[in-house]
């Protein structure tokens, strides 16, 4: 995880209304995402995750590149939870609230009984993942594994759920500095 650790120490931190926001290639697509970093992250996820699932699920937008690479390597179909409604039969809307925004997301092509692996870039406030897990639980799926690349240590909406989250690296961001735990 040498590349990931290096990139975290080099990542800019910006203030978003009092929230220290990490700007990182994995979680934001800027600065540029080098193939070596993406490869390192995908290999590590593959070594730690359970791929005995029916579908890999990733929220738009920054989970897509990770889930795509994993789908290509494992031949497990990919479902993207979108920020836009398509009005398709069976579409499920969910409301997410994070430390810096609120919005709706939409789930398609997920059915009761599906075994799911959720992949995302960053767990910070947990609002996105908690909303997704709640909706997938309501649908009747079996969430087999939840993997994030970066977990920002602190209170998270995921703490209130019965789902464990695996992270490749845990960090704190304080006074504009990233510390790897």
From Swiss-Prot:
Keyword Transferase assigned: yes
Entry keywords, A to Z: Purine salvage, Transferase
Protein EC: 2.4.2.-
Matches recorded under Pfam families: Pribosyltran
GO molecular function terms listed in the Swiss-Prot or TrEMBL record: transferase activity
CDD domains: PRTases_typeI
Chain ranges passing through the membrane: none
Biological processes per GO annotation: purine ribonucleoside salvage
Keyword ATP-binding: no
Cited function: May catalyze a purine salvage reaction, the substrate is unknown.
NCBIfam families named among the record's database cross-references: HPT_Archaea, PRK02304.1-4
Family affiliation: Belongs to the purine/pyrimidine phosphoribosyltransferase family. Archaeal HPRT subfamily.
Matches recorded under PANTHER family: HYPOXANTHINE/GUANINE PHOSPHORIBOSYLTRANSFERASE, XANTHINE PHOSPHORIBOSYLTRANSFERASE
Protein name: HGPRTase-like protein 2
Organism: Haloquadratum walsbyi (strain DSM 16790 / HBSQ001)
């Amino acid at each position: 995880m040498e590349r990931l650790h290096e990139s975290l120490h080099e990542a800019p931190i910006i203030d978003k209304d009092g929230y220290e926001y990490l700007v990182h290639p994995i979680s934001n697509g800027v600065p540029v995402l080098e193939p070596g970093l993406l490869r390192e992250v995908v290999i590590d996820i593959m070594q730690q995750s359970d791929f005995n699932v029916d579908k890999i699920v990733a929220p738009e937008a920054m989970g897509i590149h990770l889930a795509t690479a994993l789908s290509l390597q494992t031949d497990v179909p990919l479902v993207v939870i979108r920020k836009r409604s398509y009005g398709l039969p069976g579409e499920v809307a969910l409301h997410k609230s994070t430390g810096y925004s609120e919005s709706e997301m939409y789930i398609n092509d997920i059915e009761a009984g599906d075994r799911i692996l959720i992949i995302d870039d960053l767990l910070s406030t947990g609002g996105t993942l908690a909303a997704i897990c709640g909706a997938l639980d309501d649908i009747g799926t079996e969430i087999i594994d939840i993997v994030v690349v970066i977990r920002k240590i602190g209170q998270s909406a995921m703490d209130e759920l019965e789902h464990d989250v695996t992270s490749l690296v845990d960090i704190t961001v304080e006074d504009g500095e990233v510390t790897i735990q």
